[in-house]
């Protein structure tokens, strides 16, 4: 399988306080998007949409030498960015990784019972494909990765060894290699589990950043599900290296 990378960046990764090894887009990068090109959309009257950014495919897309000093800033009230690309994300099977560099803006965000979403392209009710990646303090602080394995819904929880801090950059990485699914924070392993079968991250729904990706859905109390992120996202990359590593 051809190696495919989707890279989104807003600051030069060499300045990150988190370990940056392996984060630079390389010669296999086929799509690149700069967070700074978008301002934040916001849900209004519980029905609005955020801004849309189209990923432009290109051969050997380079990381720009001069980048803005800030990433995409989210207010936690419904602002988000939507990624439009054919089939949402072309990561269908084999080994993969998802990397996110972020920092939280408030203590209230980290204590919020519902947690927050970083990126995803499926709703809670979709079972056979797509993914969600976020944070939850419910029954212990953890990162949550919801996905589909052989057409069945699965959830991978990675408990935090210590609380997140506001104003600090973190590198979060979800990775599958062979039969191991792992979660790392600043290159430190948080959790690992064995998986056998095909994980399908692709979904026809566009991936949304900084919010629950199906903003029309409501909870049992008929409240709109938002769980918006409050903070800054600086870098996101998807890598599909396939079973043969090519």
Regions found by a protein language model. Name each.
Residues 168-182:
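Localized edge beta-strand/strand-to-loop motifs within extracellular or lumenal beta-rich domains
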Residues 193-232:
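Flexible glycan-contacting loops in extracellular carbohydrate-active proteins
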Residues 115-147:
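Glycan-recognition/cleft segments
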Residues 5, 18-78, 87, 93, ...:
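Extracytoplasmic low-complexity segments
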Residues 146-171:
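Short, aromatic/His-centered strand-loop micro-motif at the edge of beta-sheets
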Residues 4-13:
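Sec-dependent N-terminal signal peptides
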Residues 31-39, 97-106, 215, 223-246:
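Extracellular, beta-strand-rich glycan-interacting domains
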Residues 86-88, 159-163, 196-197:
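Beta-strand-rich interaction surfaces with strong enrichment in secreted/lumenal proteins
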């Amino acid at each position: 399988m051809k190696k495919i990378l989707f890279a989104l960046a807003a600051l030069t990764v060499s300045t990150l306080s988190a370990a940056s090894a392996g984060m630079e887009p390389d010669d296999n990068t086929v799509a690149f998007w700069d967070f700074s090109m978008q301002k934040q959309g916001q849900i209004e009257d519980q029905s609005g949409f955020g801004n849309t950014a189209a990923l432009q495919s290109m051969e050997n897309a380079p990381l720009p030498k001069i980048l803005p000093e800030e990433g995409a800033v989210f207010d936690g009230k419904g602002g988000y960015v939507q990624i439009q690309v054919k089939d949402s994300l072309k990561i269908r099977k084999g080994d993969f990784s998802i990397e996110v560099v972020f920092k939280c803006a408030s203590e209230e965000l980290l204590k919020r019972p519902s947690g927050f979403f970083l990126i995803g392209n499926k709703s809670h009710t979709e079972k056979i494909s797509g993914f969600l990646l976020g944070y939850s303090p419910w029954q212990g602080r953890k990162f949550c990765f919801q996905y589909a394995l052989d057409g069945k819904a699965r959830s991978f929880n990675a408990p935090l060894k210590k609380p997140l801090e506001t104003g600090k950059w973190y590198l979060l990485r979800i990775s599958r290699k062979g039969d191991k699914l792992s979660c790392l924070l600043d290159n430190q392993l948080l959790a690992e589990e064995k998986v056998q079968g095909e994980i399908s991250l692709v979904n026809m729904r566009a991936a949304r950043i900084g919010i629950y990706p199906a903003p029309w859905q409501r909870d049992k109390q008929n409240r709109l599900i938002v769980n918006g992120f409050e903070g800054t996202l600086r870098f996101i990359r998807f890598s599909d290296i396939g079973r043969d590593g090519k």
